[in-house]
Amino acid sequence: MTYTLQHLEDKEAFQASFDLMRVLRSHVANQATYVAQLVRQTQQGYRLMAAWGGEHIVGLAGYRELENLLYGRFIYVDDLVVSPDLQHSGLGAWLLSAVREEAMQRSCDHFVLDTGLHMPLAQRFYFRQGLLARGMHFTQSLRAEGLA
């Protein structure tokens, strides 16, 4: 099958991506909340690239361009997900490569993402794509239940 890439930029397109994004972000339970958050994130520079197989979204890569003292200008990949029946097909590598190419076109210095310590298969995938583990990501919930 031939796949095409397209950035999703409106609420209808975001709605169409909801079911696939839930494969990665299962805690996002409500489509309306998801769409509203994507609208906010796009106002902050987030872009959502979709791989289409015919009329269906079969892969997503969400990312943003940032700049800091550690990396200079860089692309940060927030989300990368491929339809479960197409995993190991090369589609994830193709999406990641397309985002990396955009980073190079934008003269970014680095290409950065995080993956969970509980996801060894994802870690192996990222190593195969040429990414290296350079640190450990720490987080703390600022909700009342996270401060106890």
Where are these regions (language model features)?
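Conserved N-terminal entry element of GNAT/NAT acetyltransferase domains
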Residues: 1-11, 146-148
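Active-site rim helix/loop that mediates acceptor-substrate recognition in acyltransferases
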Residues: 28-48
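Conserved beta-strand in the GNAT
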Residues: 50, 56-65, 81
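A conserved beta-turn-beta hairpin within the catalytic core of GNAT-like acetyltransferases
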Residues: 66-77, 87, 133-134
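Conserved active-site alpha-helix within GNAT-family acetyltransferase domains
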Residues: 93, 117-136, 140
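Conserved GNAT acetyl-CoA-binding A-motif
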Residues: 103-115
